């Protein structure tokens, strides 16, 4: 049986930051959840939250012992994308590099398909 490709990449930088945040919270059950909501200046926006549970149908991507969780509705907009963590002049944040987005806003937090 062939291995199935993971439809979303969870970078080492993002996983390491999640690991640090989980350690600070002292709750090993936490997982980073990425989701899509309507809104933002381009129609859809990315959201990130910590969640202790997973739901039926959630995709779980593991890296360095930490988990990224995505619900099925959000996943359809994120397939082929990458969840990363960056630190720069604008501050530090989790970002999504999404090949499905036809346009993105200047700050990168919203997009359209």
Curated annotation (Swiss-Prot):
The keyword Iron applies. Binds 1 iron-sulfur cluster per subunit. Its cofactor is iron-sulfur cluster. Transmembrane segments: none annotated. GO terms for molecular function: 2 iron, 2 sulfur cluster binding; 4 iron, 4 sulfur cluster binding; iron ion binding. One of its GO terms (cellular component) is cytosol. GO terms for biological process: iron-sulfur cluster assembly. It holds the Pfam family Fe-S_biosyn. Iron-sulfur cluster binds at residues 41, 105, 107. SUPFAM superfamilies: HesB-like domain. Keywords: Iron, Iron-sulfur, Metal-binding. PROSITE patterns: HESB. Homodimer. Belongs to the HesB/IscA family. Required for insertion of 4Fe-4S clusters for at least IspG. NCBIfam families: iron-sulfur cluster assembly accessory protein (TIGR00049), PRK13623.1 (NF010147). PANTHER family: IRON-SULFUR CLUSTER ASSEMBLY 2 HOMOLOG, MITOCHONDRIAL. This is Iron-sulfur cluster insertion protein ErpA. It comes from Histophilus somni (strain 129Pt) (Haemophilus somnus). The gene is erpA.
């Amino acid at each position: 049986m062939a291995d199935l490709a993971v439809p979303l990449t969870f970078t080492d930088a993002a996983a390491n930051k999640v690991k640090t945040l989980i350690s600070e919270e002292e709750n090993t059950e936490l997982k980073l959840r990425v989701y899509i909501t309507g809104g933002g200046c381009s129609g859809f926006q990315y959201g990130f939250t910590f969640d202790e549970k997973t739901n039926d149908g959630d995709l779980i991507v593991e890296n360095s012992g930490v988990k990224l969780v995505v619900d099925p509705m959000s996943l359809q907009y994120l397939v082929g994308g990458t969840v990363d963590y960056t630190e720069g002049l604008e501050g530090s944040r989790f970002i999504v590099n999404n090949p499905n987005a036809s346009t993105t806003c200047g700050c990168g937090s919203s997009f359209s398909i």
